[in-house]
């Protein structure tokens, strides 16, 4: 098993020999391999400019690698046209970003239910699942409230609930607690890790912070020659 591979069984995320360059002679990374199993959270750290966010965009099918392959739940992104990629993102991927992007004119329930509206017309079921996810992140009975009523940490909890409500195979997080104070960030990260594991998703989080990365099952460093396991 390579340093970037997780436990046995078919991974929910399988990346093989990935390479990406930027305009000019500079290569961000090459020979990148990564396997992430159900219920596993992997943190990828690295300095600014090494390609962490670019890697997430490739994993989400928003950007193309120069070489290699990405498969999500057994589906090779390279075999899909843009319409099929969009459908896969909506159905199988959840996103958590540093910016919360909670719409102020919608209730918290409606914000969390947004991914369901893209894949299912059943509004009653969507509301029920949104309320259940809000309960799961510690916002019991708050579905009828609005973003203005919440702290930064609570807003990120809403973002985590929204990322998980459609039961995705893969959760991608880009500096998910970068705007939070250290105590709030630690609580939100613990909640995020518990949610990923509890829902059986594969989680990939990129961060520059080793303290944030410590919550993960594996910590990998991204460099020009791929990923290196920080925990040996």
Give residue spans per PLM region.
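ABC-family P-loop ATPase nucleotide-binding domain
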Residues: 1-19, 229-232
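H-loop (His-switch) and adjacent beta-strand-loop-beta switch element
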Residues: 219-232
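ABC family nucleotide-binding domain
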Residues: 12-13, 18-222
